[in-house]
Amino acid sequence: MSFRGGFRGGRGGSRGGFGGRGGARGGRPIQQGPPDTVLEMGEFMHPCEGDVVCRSINTKVPYFNAPIYLENKTQVGKVDEILGPLNEVYFTIKCGEGVQATSFKEGDKFYIAPDKLLPIERFIPKPKVAGPPKPKNKKKRSGAPAGRGGARGGFGGRGGSRGGFGGRGGSRGGFGGRGGSRGGFGGRGGSRGGFGGRGGSRGGFGGRGGSRGGFGGRGGRS
């Protein structure tokens, strides 16, 4: 199996390593002529389809299209692809005009300009820093229960409301507690034409203190 079948990750890099093309493109403007100094970049492994396959011997990662030189600063070609995981980087060199990939032997070294390298930390994902927990928004309740002296058409406490549910001091046309209501169901202090508690009602069913023409409790009259 050729190297390209073994190490090629496809175009567009993968997480935690290097795929094919794509990745650390960009950088500084193209430099004309050889650099003042060069650093060891990789060792020759074998040729592959006209390119040179190298194993990186530098702790940093080269730019794509970065010029590659021999020790005497003669340009061999440019970085074409970067391959392999972060702890074992490989790269290929696309040879320049007049340079043959088969002219090199295993162990030959290639060099690069210092300004064409990126630190390996640029390719390592940074851990997420846990921040303080976000405060939870308390939902506001719409409306509020009424206290004493309820509103009309709502739920009241003492001193009931008209047309609603009342506590003490009943409501007209509703269900009342003490202090009955007219035409409704009353507690103590009955209502006219309804069902009363103590203090009966006229024409209804009364509790204590009977009612006229109704059914009385204690002290009732027929």
From Swiss-Prot:
GO terms for cellular component: box H/ACA snoRNP complex. GO terms for molecular function: box H/ACA snoRNA binding. Belongs to the GAR1 family. Residues 4-27 are annotated as: RGG-box 1. GO terms for biological process: snoRNA guided rRNA pseudouridine synthesis; snRNA pseudouridine synthesis. The gene is GAR1. InterPro entries: Gar1/Naf1_Cbf5-bd_sf (IPR038664), H/ACA_rnp_Gar1/Naf1 (IPR007504), Transl_B-barrel_sf (IPR009000). Keywords: Nucleus, Repeat, Ribonucleoprotein, Ribosome biogenesis, RNA-binding, rRNA processing. This is H/ACA ribonucleoprotein complex subunit GAR1.
